[in-house]
Amino acid sequence: MRKNLHSNIVKSIIGIALLAFLSSCNSDPLGTTEPPVDTYNPIEYSPGSADFSNYVAIGNSLTAGFVDGALYNLGQQKSIPALLAGQLRAAGGQAVFNQPSVNSDYGCSNPGSGCTLGKYKLDADIPGPSPTLLGDPITAYAGDKTALHNFGVPGIQVGQLLTPETGIPGAAAFNPYYARFASSPGTSTILGDVLSRNPSFFTLWIGNNDVLGYATSGATNEAIFTDPAAFRARFEIVVGQLMGQTDAEGIVVDIPPILYAPYFQAVPYNPVVFDPESDADMGLVSLLNANFSGFNAALAGLQGIGQLTAADVEERKIQYTAGPNPVLIQDLNLEDLSSKFDVLATFGAITDEQRAALQPYVQARPIKQGEIITLPAGGVIGTLADPNNPTSVLGVALPLPAQFALAAADIQRIEQRRGELNAIIADVAGDYSSRIAFYNTNDPNGTFADLFGIDGSAPGIEFGGQFLNADFSPFGLFSTDGIHPNPRGAAIVANEMLDLIESSFSATLPRVNVLSLPTVALCTGQGAASDCASRVAGL
C-alpha cells in the first residue's frame, strides 16, 4: 500500500509526461532565442517623469531572488529587481544594480539545521522536489554595504523592516539574511538602510509573509498571522518614511493569491489509491474498513445519545473504497471528542482499550475536495508514524498532522486576512498616488488571475507562442519550492511592473525576454552537483 500511495503522489507532483519528454537537465527545453532587434527603427526609451538613477528594492524573498527553497546565485542574478533594473538602465537607471551576493551555487534550504542541504531540484530518481546535498552556510556579505540596491530579505514580515532586532541573533525578529548585510547589525534597520541610500525610485513588495507563514504552517501558528491593525500601523510607517524622507517615486505591490501557488495545489486531496484489480489492495481496503468499524460505531453511539448530529457523523466517518480516496487529516477546527469518548467508556459502551484506540481520531476526518494538502505532505503521506509499526500509515490509518493541510475554515480565514491586508496596502498607497503606482496582483483581469485560472480560463498563460504553466515543471513559472517564481516567472512580474511604470510615469521602457531565461531543470543521478548545476551554466 505504501508504494502505491507514494507512486501516485509522485505522478501528481512531477508529471509523468514531463519525465517521458525530458531525458537530461536541459535548462531551456523550449529552445527559445532572443528576438531580433530592429536596427533601422530603434526605440527611444525615456524615464518620463520618473528618475531611475538610484533604484532600490524593498521586500522579502520575492525581492531577494529566493528560489528553489534557497537564496543562491542564480536566483539573485535573475531576481525581479535585477531584471527590472536591467530594463530601467535603458532610461537613465544606474549602470550597476548591487545585490548582497551570497556567492553560492546551492544556497541553504535548512538554516535551522546547519545548512547541510542546498536548493531544491527535480530529480527523476526521487519523488517530488528534493534538496541538493551541498548546502552552504549563510555568511556575512563581503561587499560594500553602503552601495546596495536590493534590500530584499527572505522570510520577513512588514514589522521586521522597522526593528533592529532583525539583525540581532537570538532576538524574536532575528533574520540571518538581514544580519549578513546590515549596515550596523543590532542597531540598524532594513528601512533605515534603505533611506540612507536616498533612492530616486523604489519597489516595495511586503506583506506576503504576514499571511503566508500561517498558511504554510497549516494554520497552526497564530503568532505569525499579523493582525490587521498592527499591519496598518507598521505599513503606514514604512511608506510614510519613504515618502517623507526621500523624494522617491515608486511601486507598491499587494499580496497575490498565494493559495493558488503549487505549494498548495500540487498534491491532490485524494492520492490514496487502491487498485480494484489488485487482490492485495482490495484486501487492504477490507482490513482498513474493519479496523475503522469501531470508530464509526463510536460516532454512531454519540449520535444516538444526542452528542453528535448526523452531519457530524457523516463528516468524520472513515470508509475506504477502490480507486482514489481522500487523505485522513487532523482538523483542529473540529470539536475534540475526547470527553465524549470518555462518556462512552464511563457507561461501559466501550472498553478502556477501545477508548485508548480512539484517541488519535478525536479531531480526525477525511479531507474534502477543495481543501488543501500542502507540498511537504507529499513526502509524508503513506509513511509510517512509527517505523516499528507497519499499520501506522500517515494519512491512511492515522491522520496526517494538521500542519500539512488546510481545512475550509482555515482557507476562509487566510483569504479574509489577505483581503484585509491588501485593502490596507491599497489604501496607504492611494494616500500618495501622485508618487506611488499601485500594482494590484489581484486584478480579476490581470496576469495572476490568468495564470491561476481565477478568471475562469484554464490555468497557465501563453507567452511568445509557448504555454507556461502555474507549476514547477520545466514548462512552469514557479521554482521547485512551489512558492517563489523561477527566472521566467520573475521576468513576467518584472514586465508587469514595467507596464505599470510606463502607464503611471509616462515612461518608455524595454521588456525582459521571458523565454530567454532558464526554467526548472530535471536532474538525474540523485542530485549530483554536475547534473543540477546545468541550469546555471551558460547564463
Please provide the spans of the model-predicted regions.
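Active-site-proximal beta-strand/loop segments in catalytic clefts of secreted hydrolases
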Residues: 58-61, 204-209, 215-217, 253-257, ...
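Conserved SGNH/GDSL esterase-like catalytic core that processes O-acyl groups on lipids
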Residues: 71-237, 259, 264, 348, ...
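A structural motif corresponding to the C-terminal end of an alpha-helix
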Residues: 196-197, 234-252, 417-440
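Catalytic nucleophile-elbow at a beta strand-turn-alpha helix junction centered on a G-D-S/GDSL motif
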Residues: 53-69
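Bacterial N-terminal signal peptides that target proteins for export
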Residues: 2-13
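Bacterial Sec-dependent N-terminal signal peptides
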Residues: 2, 19-51, 507-524
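Histidine-centered active-site loop/cap adjacent to the catalytic His
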Residues: 84, 466-520
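Mobile gating loops/cap/lid regions near enzyme active sites that modulate substrate access
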Residues: 265-416, 426-483
